[in-house]
Amino acid sequence: MIQPISGPPPGQPPGQGDNLPSGTGNQPLSSQQRTSLESLMTKVTSLTQQQRAELWAGIRHDIGLSGDSPLLSRHFPAAEHNLAQRLLAAQKSHSARQLLAQLGEYLRLGNNRQAVTDYIRHNFGQTPLNQLSPEQLKTILTLLQEGKMVIPQPQQREATDRPLLPAEHNALKQLVTKLAAATGEPSKQIWQSMLELSGVKDGELIPAKLFNHLVTWLQARQTLSQQNTPTLESLQMTLKQPLDASELAALSAYIQQKYGLSAQSSLSSAQAEDILNQLYQRRVKGIDPRVMQPLLNPFPPMMDTLQNMATRPALWILLVAIILMLVWLVR
């Protein structure tokens, strides 16, 4: 433990201080000096896992004191400087841990991890992420938060019609299990949704070319399930392959047409899932997002024509005349 405010310092037997040589430098620490050291030590221990006894032993070692030598007034400047340096290092380490935790949230989204790796390699060489300075980490975090970092498109592998490998199937199974736990939706129902979206019939094997699309769909649904008010922008951040201009325009139009909302509006969970499904079908099947006509109005173009004719009697007269003429000719 750190030396107490009163009494002999640790390691000094009672009465030993009375035999110290005279002189200011050989006097025990003053109360003010001890208080200053204790304050610094408290700050260091609050930011690190070090115990006071361990920290105190390290300080004595660094300033060249043997285990049984008392800390004197002349040792105070070196001890204070040592603690100040330890505090500075602890503050930097604590700041770096906080920034790494914030970065971790972004690295899970889309292709951000590859973007950060490329940025570090280009600007900081081969330095690992956890060895960057707080200033460097802050720069990367700010670029991600402000959307100024270039996010590369994920590498596209050649599509194949082979069925999923066991490892690929197990990977999907694990993602389905996580999604079921997060949403409460039965795993069987999630699998059924995946098959229907992919156009795979019951009993057929899922082709491997759908693997990456299904992984993205499952991971996006997992992330969206944790958002109370998802938006098209937050949906886009869940994607490994960001929306291109045509996809963004198509989905924005779909949201406006079906839900009467803008691209910046908050969505319900069901709406966000519907939009994600539309994007999946566009990427897998090339089907543009569309609003299905209601079943009670299967012939909307014809109904619109009849409604227009109802407001123009002359068209009805002409139509009746044409019908009568056709009947007369047939007879």
Swiss-Prot record:
Residues 19-35 have a biased composition (Polar residues). Signal peptide: none annotated. It comes from Escherichia coli (strain K12). Residues 1-13 have a biased composition (Pro residues). The gene is flk. It is a single-pass membrane protein. One of its GO terms (cellular component) is plasma membrane. Residues 1-35 are annotated as: Disordered. Acts as a regulator of flagellar gene expression by modulating the protein level of the anti sigma factor FlgM upon sensing ring completion or hook elongation. Flk could inhibit FlgM secretion by acting as a braking system for the flagellar-associated type III secretion (T3S) system. Plays a role in hindering to flip the flagellar T3S specificity switch from the rod and hook-type substrates to filament-type substrates prior to hook-basal body (HBB) completion possibly by preventing interaction of FliK with FlhB. Residues 331 are periplasmic. The chain crosses the membrane at residues 310-330. This is Flagellar regulator flk. It is found in: Cell inner membrane. GO terms for biological process: regulation of gene expression. Belongs to the flk family. InterPro entries: Flagellar_regulator_Flk. Keywords: Cell inner membrane, Cell membrane, Membrane, Transmembrane, Transmembrane helix. Residues 1-309 are cytoplasmic.
